Regions:
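Hydrophobic alpha-helical segments at protein termini of multi-pass membrane proteins
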Residues: 1-226
Length: 226
């Protein structure tokens, strides 16, 4: 019985390092200090969206590649890819949905304890109540669905990178970067143009189905090699 814990942990670390420690601070804290970048961001929104999508693809997919290439030399089976993707997508879900849930829990606990006079996370009691009431069953289900679809997409991208490494096909890294960028760019365009989460979810569902098919095909190839 194989132990997939290392693959899971490396997957989580890759997301944390590439996004939380590198890409986001670089964009939000370093590049914003340059006037040329702020002009680009303000006057060329379409190009900026494409830039964000490409950088997300480059950082995350190169991170996956380095993770398998350098630290998982003896952990390159199909199950390792699944574990890596679960760690990668899991830490993302924790940092995105988890923090939001914790935020709402703090508000709820303060309201239940009768904290009506002080502030709750910088808001007065009425503002906190409005913020908490804005969270409904539909929004919770939407977040849950979005995270599941994102996990499937992470799985597909991980398998593409792992397949490229295992079978010495370096161009598969470029394919993963391109697919990642396309997914993110279209999500941003749909969200900004249509302003509806419904169509964003539809697009993510389509992508998830495609990546499921890709994952199944790669699984068949992996098990033929066993």
């Amino acid at each position: 019985k194989r132990n997939y814990l290392k693959s899971y942990v490396i997957g989580a670390l890759v997301f944390f390092i590439t996004q939380i420690c590198l890409r986001l601070p670089l964009i939000n804290n370093v590049m914003v200090k340059f006037d040329s970048f702020n002009i680009f961001k303000s006057f060329y929104p379409v190009a900026y969206i494409i830039f964000l999508g490409i950088t997300a693809g480059v950082f995350e997919e190169c991170g996956r590649y380095m993770g398998f290439k350098l630290t998982l030399k003896k952990h390159r089976r199909f199950g390792d890819g699944v574990a890596f993707a679960l760690g990668h997508g899991g830490i993302e879900a924790l940092l995105i949905a988890g923090i939001s849930s914790l935020y709402n829990l703090i508000i709820l606990l303060n309201l239940n304890l009768g904290n009506d006079n002080g502030t709750i996370l910088g808001m007065d009691a009425n503002e906190a109540m409005i913020a908490f009431n804005s969270v409904n069953n539909i929004s919770v289900l939407t977040i849950g669905l979005e995270r599941i679809l994102a996990m499937v997409i992470h799985l597909g991208l991980t398998m593409i990178v792992l397949y490229g490494i295992k079978f010495s096909k370096k161009h598969y890294l470029l394919i993963a970067i391109a697919l990642h960028a396309i997914v993110d760019v279209v999500v941003a365009f749909i969200g900004s143009i249509m302003g509806s989460l419904f169509w964003v979810e539809v697009w993510c569902l389509i992508c998830a189905i495609i990546f499921i098919i890709i994952t199944i095909k790669i699984k068949e190839i992996f098990y033929k090699e066993v």
